[in-house]
């Protein structure tokens, strides 16, 4: 009871502070809304909405079940995912946030995944899309196609490792599980339902992007004088992915560290992506409780892989190195590897204990 009162008091004070800030600084909120809607209109809707429609049609017309029947064994062996979840993993890798969550939710609604299988698949089938990685990061931020290729490959490898680390091997019954027979809808009905679902998902995404754009604006205003430019990508990216990635352009860190930050942000997604994903999961009756932990783990793996691979692809040649980069590499490199190793061991132990106790 005391804890509930304390939580209610904190929420009330937070709301009062939010109202006060909106009344005192309405221009910042208005600019954040304009920036968020511009991002939605110019980047998010053109890239996501058509893919939402196509991915919904892919599932509703039964192609997902056919592909899973033929290639589901590969997903079970490589990813330790149920065979029917393999198509959702591919949709998540190619469609961007939160297309994978939407695909998993639809598979769950159709009975092709159990609740436990869907909850785990939500956490590992949700990735940034290649259009954002190559177009925005590889083109606008790093201005080198190699950066986009490295980030995309690292994200895929980190996603596969996260799948394997957070799931136990499938039983023979799970490997052999097939989707229940579904009534085959005609194309017109499937198309109408696909567009409706895509529209609702796109609206949810844009709402969260706009809200977190406002929060990012207030964060810049509050911490602008005290937040170093090199810390801005992580601070802003923890709220909203695109804002954090855009801040990398003004960052003076060495290219390898900018790539490590970009890898972490891409795989983690930020609070905005997590909120979008939880909302999409809730539409299907799922909770998505494993999302934050799995995305943090994937971000740590992605940053560590980038740090290991960067010297091999000579990323320092992509742009001029900044002063002090060698010193920073010598001191911070072992620290990042140590933290990533600790995170890997912690989450592996945690999720295996949860699975053994049957609490997932």
Walk through the language-model features, giving the residues of each.
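Selected transmembrane alpha-helices and immediately adjacent juxtamembrane segments
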Residues: 13-26, 33, 37-45, 49-53, ...
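Transmembrane helical segments that form the transport core of multi-pass membrane transport proteins
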Residues: 61-63, 191, 195-266, 270
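Membrane helical hairpin/interfacial module
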Residues: 42, 46-107
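Alpha-helical membrane segments and immediately flanking helix-loop junctions
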Residues: 78-142, 235-250, 260-284, 293-296
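C-terminal transmembrane helix pair
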Residues: 114-116, 131-132, 258-351
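Short, amphipathic, aromatic/basic-enriched membrane-interface segments that mark the entry/exit
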Residues: 19, 59, 117-125, 181, ...
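Transmembrane helix-loop junctions at the membrane interface of multipass transporters and ion channels
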Residues: 27, 130-146, 311-318
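Alpha-helical transmembrane segments in multi-pass membrane proteins
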Residues: 42, 47, 51, 55, ...
């Amino acid at each position: 009871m005391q804890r509930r009162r304390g939580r209610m008091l904190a929420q009330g004070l937070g709301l009062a502070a939010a109202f006060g800030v909106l009344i005192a600084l309405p221009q910042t909120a208005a600019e954040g809304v304009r920036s968020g809607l511009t991002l939605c209109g110019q980047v998010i809707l053109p890239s996501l909405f058509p893919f939402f429609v196509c991915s919904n049609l892919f599932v509703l017309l039964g192609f997902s079940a056919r592909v899973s029947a033929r290639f589901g064994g590969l997903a079970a062996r490589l990813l330790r995912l149920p065979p029917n979840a393999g198509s959702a993993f591919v949709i998540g890798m190619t469609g961007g946030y939160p297309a994978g969550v939407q695909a998993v939710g639809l598979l769950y609604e159709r009975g092709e995944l159990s609740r436990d299988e869907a909850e785990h698949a939500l956490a590992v089938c949700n990735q940034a899309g290649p259009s954002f990685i190559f177009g925005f990061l590889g083109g606008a931020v790093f201005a080198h196609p190699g950066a986009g290729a490295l980030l995309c490959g690292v994200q895929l490898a980190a996603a596969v490792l996260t799948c394997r680390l957070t799931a136990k091997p499938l039983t023979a019954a799970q490997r052999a599980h097939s989707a229940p027979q579904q009534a085959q809808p005609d194309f017109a009905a499937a198309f109408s339902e696909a567009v409706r679902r895509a529209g609702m998902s796109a609206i949810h995404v844009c709402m969260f992007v706009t809200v977190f754009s406002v929060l990012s604006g207030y964060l810049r205003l509050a911490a602008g004088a005290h937040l170093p430019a090199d810390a801005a990508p992580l601070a802003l990216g923890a709220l909203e992915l695109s804002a954090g990635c855009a801040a990398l352009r003004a960052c003076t860190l060495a290219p390898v560290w900018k790539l490590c930050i970009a890898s972490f942000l891409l795989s983690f997604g930020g609070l905005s992506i997590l909120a979008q994903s939880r909302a999409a999961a809730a539409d299907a009756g799922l909770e998505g409780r494993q999302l934050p932990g799995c995305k943090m783990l994937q971000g740590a793996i992605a940053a560590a892989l980038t740090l290991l691979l960067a010297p091999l692809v000579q990323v320092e040649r992509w742009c001029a190195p900044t002063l002090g980069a060698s010193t920073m590499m010598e001191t911070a490199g072992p620290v990042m590897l140590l933290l990533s190793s600790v995170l890997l061991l912690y989450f592996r132990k945690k999720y295996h204990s949860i699975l053994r106790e049957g609490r997932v």
